[in-house]
């Protein structure tokens, strides 16, 4: 087994020790297929996530579910975004990504509006974190570095925010 493969296996085992169910997919399309098959007839809330957009999960899941995606509602202004964000907190299922995950089985998220973090913590029948290998870091310190130097600046640029990290 390669060092790369060992790192992934070690991370999956750490998440299992922390009582998370973990699935691994060789291709992004397989992950999207899995979620589309698993989630049917539900109200589904989304946290703001480029990962979910890249997998076309909104389009895939809305075929058999009612999907609430605050960024899509946000085109109607901040009030529409906030209303959809509150509604997403009351759904059966919640999907989001993470800014970073550690090899120790920890999830790191920094959230501007709070809707992603709030949605990940309470109330849903199921919560799915959809993360790519690009989010994997050795430890919390590396995760914080990833947030400060990769995730937050990209998010600020995408949203046109003039935050210190976006410079």
Short names for language-model regions:
Residues 4-95:
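N-terminal active-site beta-alpha-beta segment that forms phosphate/nucleotide-binding
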